[in-house]
Each structure stands twice: as C-alpha cells, then as structure tokens.
Amino acid sequence: MKRILAALLSFALCLALLFFVRNKSDEPILHVALKSSGEQDAAYVCETVYASGKSRACDAFTPDTCVFYTADYADFDTSALRSHRVNTLVATTLYDSVGNVVEPDETMIAMMHAAADQIDHAIFDFQIIVVNGQRYFAFVKLNVNWWDPCTLYEYEGGELRELAQWDNMRLLSIGFI
C-alpha cells in the first residue's frame, strides 16, 4: 500500500513539474498606459505585459510613438451561426485621433479581416495602433454580457496574437522594453 501511495505521489509531482516547465515564460514584452473607460476623472495606470498573458502594475515609462485609428462601429457585423457568433467585416472605415476619415493601408485591412475571423464575440470597439510606424497592435473591446473585455493583440504574420486582457479600459500608449 505504501509503495502504491509513493508511486502516485511521485507521479503527481512529475505532472506538477511538467506543468510548470511547459508554462509560458513570464518575460516582460511591453508597457502600456491604461485608463478606466467608465470614469472620466480616473487616473491612468501603467502596467507591464508579460509573454504569459499576465500584466502587472509598473512605474511610469516613456511611451513609443503611437498612432491610433478607430474603426467605425458599423465595420463589423455580428450574427449567430449555430452555437457561436460570427463576425463579418462589412466595411473598412477608419478614423484618426481627431475624427477624420483615413484610408487604411493593406496591413490595417488585413488586421480587420483577421479580427473578424479570429474573434468569436461581437466587436464593440476596434482600434489599430501603429507603434513607431512599424509594429501593428489592435485593442478590441467586446460586447459580452456582464463585463467589457478589452484585449490587446499584436498583428504579425497575418494573425492577431493575444497579449493581455483587461475589463473596461482605454489604451493610452505603448512602450517597448
């Protein structure tokens, strides 16, 4: 009986070790400045985003040059298909930070198509952030029942890669580490 118990304990320890070894590294990849969407007077918060998808509070940082573009609310159409939601890109209207309509480049249009293909909830707000004129990010607010998930994605290789998620926040800036 003791041997069986010892073998089970050893097996459980090996599984736990395997789980921790296979876990994504907690390497910091970038800083973000965020502000609560619900409160006008709320202070902004700075967080470090890690490769594992986690984010933690950090000190103030120097942001990189970020240009924000916001998709028109009618660019994405959401419908229910069988047991899940399907997003369809119906237009590619983008606005700059002043509210002027801008012509999206090929990468921005590809990002919008990737969002429609990859995201399985109704897209409430879609922002494209071009950092230093080279790297593309998307900040997507979804229409989900009891909360407003806001997810930061990096666009690379034709796909959106999820970096981190918050509840009901606005992205103000990004700074590379």
What does each model-found stretch correspond to?
Residues 33, 41-52, 56-60, 67, ...:
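Short beta-strand elements that form the blades of beta-propeller/WD-repeat-like
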Residues 29-39, 124-133, 175-177:
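Structural signature of eukaryotic scaffold interfaces centered on beta-propeller domains
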Residues 18-28:
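Sec-dependent signal peptide cleavage junction
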Residues 1-4:
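Positively charged n-region of N-terminal signal peptides that target proteins for export
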Residues 82-117, 169-176:
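Surface-exposed loop and turn segments in beta-propeller and other repeat-based domains
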Residues 55, 63-68, 146-152:
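Structural motif
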Residues 7-19:
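Hydrophobic membrane-insertion alpha-helices, especially the h-region
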Residues 156-158:
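Short loop/turn segments that connect beta-strands within beta-propeller blades
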